[in-house]
């Protein structure tokens, strides 16, 4: 029984030494790679910024909830103005443009001639004013009701 405990203690000591060596070599690699990162680039993707403050995920300028740039395109953001999720002009929730098309979704601007993925949930006299956000949402059949 004592020999098993001694063997386990020896294995633990070897594991501890190996992990310390790996951590030390990882620290030197990280310090070398930090020199190549520009200080103004922060966040998810490229072109500066972060989740809630400038830049964007895969575009440039703007962010998730702020302004300028967007997820995959340019100009605007997820909930703020200008641009949209995949394109340009308008935004996801607030007027002008739309999620993947043109002309507005969830807050003004009309549908711009493109379709609503889950149907139209509010139809005005000039066509669809608000697309459904999920398939089970109630669909309005009469304009203005």
Swiss-Prot record:
Residues 32-43 have a biased composition (Basic and acidic residues). The keyword Repeat applies. The keyword Repeat applies. It is found in: Secreted, Extracellular space, Extracellular matrix. The Cys-rich C-terminus (111-145) is essential for the interaction with WAK1. Belongs to the GRP family. This is Glycine-rich protein 3. The lineage of its organism: Eukaryota, Viridiplantae, Streptophyta, Embryophyta, Tracheophyta.
């Amino acid at each position: 029984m004592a020999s098993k405990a001694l063997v386990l203690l020896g294995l633990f000591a070897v594991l501890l030494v190996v992990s310390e060596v790996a951590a030390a070599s990882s620290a030197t690699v990280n310090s070398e790679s930090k020199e190549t990162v520009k200080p103004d680039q922060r966040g998810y993707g490229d072109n500066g910024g972060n989740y809630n403050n400038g830049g964007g995920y895969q575009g440039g300028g703007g962010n998730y909830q702020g302004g300028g740039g967007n997820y995959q395109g340019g100009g605007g953001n997820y909930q703020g103005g200008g641009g949209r999720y995949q394109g340009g002009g308008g935004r996801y929730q607030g007027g002008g443009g739309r999620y993947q098309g043109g002309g507005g979704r969830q807050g003004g601007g009309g549908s711009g001639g493109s379709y609503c993925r889950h149907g139209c949930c509010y139809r005005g006299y000039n066509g669809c004013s608000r697309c459904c956000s999920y398939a089970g949402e109630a669909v309005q059949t009469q304009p203005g009701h």
